[in-house]
Amino acid sequence: MQLYTANGNWRKTFRSVLLGLAVGLTLALLNVLALKISQGGSKSWQNPVSALVDALQPAVVDEVIYRFALWSLLWVVLNKTTPEKAVWLSGLLAMLVHTYQHFDDLFIQSPLIAIGMGAVMAIFWGIPPLILARRRGLESAIAFHWIQDVARFVTGF
């Protein structure tokens, strides 16, 4: 996984961020629609400028912890036994950990529903940033995550 910002490659960083935003925008709208259906409406709309800033923290922190650190640690372990599959397998495992950590309470109440909801969430909002991070750099996954959170925060979720 690349981190173009660390190398000072601003052109690739910019292109990576734009791609993450482009891929993420449609799925961000789908995310808000799914939340409206599943939660019955928004809580309270947030100031758009605040949403832009507030969305940076979860986007950067989640992607650095799960996409960069956990993926890297799992790769170190898996590369010894399955070197040809280690990159994607470790990325998939890190993505599943990140996805299912959103359903900790639901696992206690309704484990099968948590598994199903996590699977849907992984398909729509886990696999795209996994592919973006692997193919276009960590910045692309951060941008994808950021636009998801901006849309959610602005609309009150």
Annotate each PLM feature.
Residues 1-60, 75-81:
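Juxtamembrane helix-loop-helix connectors linking adjacent transmembrane helices
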